[in-house]
Amino acid sequence: MIRGRKRDGTVHARPDVCLSSMDDFFLRKPPAMDESPRLRPLSRAEARNLDLRAVRELGLPTLVLMENAGRSAARWFLEDWLSQGKGNLTDHKVLILCGPGSNGGDGGVMARWLDLAGVLVRVAWVSGPVPRLPAGDAAIQRDALAKAGFDQQDWVLPEDNAKLAKSLSWCTWVVDALLGTGLTRPIDGAFRTAVEMINDSGKPVYALDLPSGLDADTGEPLGVALRATATATFVAPKLACQYKEAEEYLGEVAVLPIGLPYALLEDYIEED
């Protein structure tokens, strides 16, 4: 019997979910990379183009891709990180920092899966210095979490830096779903301060797609970048992953599938 958490943080038995293994929880394990085509590192533009092709050529809604990404990220996080060492999943408190774009939406999906596994989750939708709520698919994720009663907050930096500091003291892990691969300009101002606060906290960071602030093409920090313990990058490695200088920001990297078929991937298969 799975043990989960109520919204007040107390642990309770969940008789409606009886699981013999994590495989049962996720129904079917996503294919390991050694069982799937090995793809060469992709540029920021190539990764974006793959998503667009999935929508235009296959008719896949972007919300489906987001759901698949968040689910894959939650699985690796639960199996290879939260389940390691002593203690139970319910001993962890995970702070998921979401930006207003699709990377934040991936974090919103991940929050639901972690909650289902019994992990205590706090979600913060972060913007600043001008307030900006999530749009599109990310807004759908935010609304779903709100209706499900999640511990969910809207932060505008730098005004809410104190909330960030308090949550960093509270959590055992930080999930970085702030900026993803689309960033092209240096991080400055309020977001730079936030990145520095997270790095200085010493809390392990699990980054979605790429650590916030790391240039997807060059592997260099755009002013400043989060130093992740682990990075879950989707579909294929990004160009940044091939540079030794980026290792201190990436941590351990896993390439996770989001359900794109071979027909879309064959042009990017790495040659022997």
Swiss-Prot record:
InterPro entries: YjeF_N_dom (IPR004443), YjeF_N_dom_sf (IPR036652)
Name recorded for this polypeptide: NAD(P)H-hydrate epimerase
Keywords, comma-separated and alphabetical: Isomerase, Metal-binding, NAD, NADP, Nucleotide-binding, Potassium
Function: Catalyzes the epimerization of the S- and R-forms of NAD(P)HX, a damaged form of NAD(P)H that is a result of enzymatic or heat-dependent hydration. This is a prerequisite for the S-specific NAD(P)H-hydrate dehydratase to allow the repair of both epimers of NAD(P)HX.
Catalysed reactions listed for this entry: (6R)-NADHX = (6S)-NADHX; (6R)-NADPHX = (6S)-NADPHX
EC number annotated for this UniProt entry: 5.1.99.6
Family: Belongs to the NnrE/AIBP family.
Domain of life, per lineage: Bacteria
A family per Pfam: YjeF_N
YjeF N-terminal domain ranges (all copies): 47-266
Positions bound to (6S)-NADPHX: 102-106, 180-186, 209
Keyword NADP included in the entry's annotation: yes
GO MF term set: metal ion binding; NAD(P)HX epimerase activity; nucleotide binding
Entry cofactors: K(+)
Cofactor note: Binds 1 potassium ion per subunit.
Residues engaged in binding K(+): 103, 176, 212
Class of this enzyme: isomerase
